[in-house]
Swiss-Prot record:
Gene Ontology terms: cellular component: plasma membrane
Additional note from the record: Most taste cells may be activated by a limited number of bitter compounds; individual taste cells can discriminate among bitter stimuli.
Endpoints of the signal sequence: none
Cytoplasmic side: 29-55, 107-128, 206-232, 283-303
Family indicated by similarity: Belongs to the G-protein coupled receptor T2R family.
Organism: Papio hamadryas (Hamadryas baboon)
One GO molecular-function entry: G protein-coupled receptor activity
Sugar attachment sites: 166
Transmembrane segments: 8-28, 56-76, 86-106, 129-149, 185-205, 233-253, 262-282
Protein name as annotated: Taste receptor type 2 member 13
UniProt keywords, alphabetically: G-protein coupled receptor, Glycoprotein, Membrane, Receptor, Sensory transduction, Taste, Transducer, Transmembrane, Transmembrane helix
Cellular localisation: Membrane
Ranges of the Extracellular topological domain: 1-7, 77-85, 150-184, 254-261
Topology class, membrane: Multi-pass membrane protein
Length: 303
């Protein structure tokens, strides 16, 4: 029964891998073509491009770690290979989370309307704010890598003291649990910032819609429709982001109690976030949405 469920989850992971690479790759391709043709790219398109690149890397890392964990191959990886694999996972996960958070801050500063002097100051300097936040996150990345490297070194030393590299499968959680715990702790900051940003954005959009409904009774202008669509995308993103964060927590707890099935199930749900959210970003971006419709029309015409 357990092997059948793992086979089903593996098929789901592969499907998410293909969908995630196609959707994120599409966004990178369209923005790069636009960048080459126009010699410039808007701030939001730059964020979307680098976000898509980081998620492609993250999806590949998640797929590799899935098959390594599924076939118990992680314990046979050399010390250098282990560091490369985990460091690349940490870096891709870091930029995936923080670029998504920066995107939420960008939307907040661009769309939301508050009368606070501090908010207006940040709103007028949105590009500088985004750049400073991105540079500031490198401090978190550096600290994260240092802490992860300590866990790797301790685990490798423990393996050497046991004189057998694959001393036991029960020893693997002694390495993976502290790594997952560290990743969870460093994910708290971007998750909290994104949550606050989107709650403020939702509050601002609702307030704006209420004002427009009073001024335009029985009439819905294009701007109102755009705000409603933005609100739907924001809520969807918030739910996906929350589910991804919860999966990290549950996965860490399941490994602590060595529950393989729950751990694999959480990994499957976790991959759904970087794979599916790109579709929401494509639908929410006029340029990407138009390009996707053109591609879909050409594919349909060839059929």
């Amino acid at each position: 029964m357990e092997s059948a469920l793992l086979s089903i989850l593996t098929l789901v992971i592969i499907a998410e891998f293909v969908i995630g690479n196609l959707s994120n790759g599409f966004x990178v391709l369209i923005n790069c073509i636009d960048w080459v043709s126009k010699r410039q790219l808007s701030s939001v398109d730059k964020i979307l491009t680098f976000l898509a690149i980081s998620r492609i890397g993250l999806i590949w890392e998640l797929l590799v770690s899935w098959f390594l964990g599924l076939h118990y191959l992680a314990i046979f990886v050399s010390g250098t290979g282990l560091r490369i694999m985990i460091f690349s996972w940490v870096v891709s996960n870091h930029f995936s989370l923080w670029l998504a958070t920066i995107l939420s801050i960008f939307y907040l500063l661009k769309i939301a309307s508050f009368s606070s002097p501090a908010f207006l100051y940040l709103k007028w300097r949105v590009n500088q704010v985004i750049l400073m936040i991105l540079l500031g996150t490198l401090v978190f990345l550096f600290l994260n890598l240092i802490q992860i490297n300590i866990h790797i070194k301790d685990w490798l030393d423990r393996c050497e003291r046991n004189t057998i590299w694959n001393f036991s499968m029960s020893g693997l959680p002694t390495f993976s649990v502290p790594v997952k715990f560290t990743m969870t702790m460093f994910s708290l900051a971007p998750f909290t910032v994104a949550l606050i940003s989107f709650l403020l954005l939702i509050f601002s959009l609702r307030k704006h819609l209420q004002k427009m409904q009073l001024n335009y009774k029985g009439h819905r202008e294009p701007r109102t429709k755009a705000h409603i669509n933005a609100l739907k995308i924001v809520i969807s993103f918030l739910l996906l982001y929350a589910s991804f964060f919860l999966c990290i927590l549950i996965s860490w707890i399941s490994e602590l109690y060595q529950n393989t099935l729950i751990h694999m199930f959480c990994q499957t749900i976790g991959v759904f976030y970087p794979s599916s959210h790109s579709f929401l970003l494509i639908l929410g971006n006029p340029k990407l949405r138009q390009a996707s419709l053109l591609v879909a029309a050409k594919v349909w015409a060839k059929r």
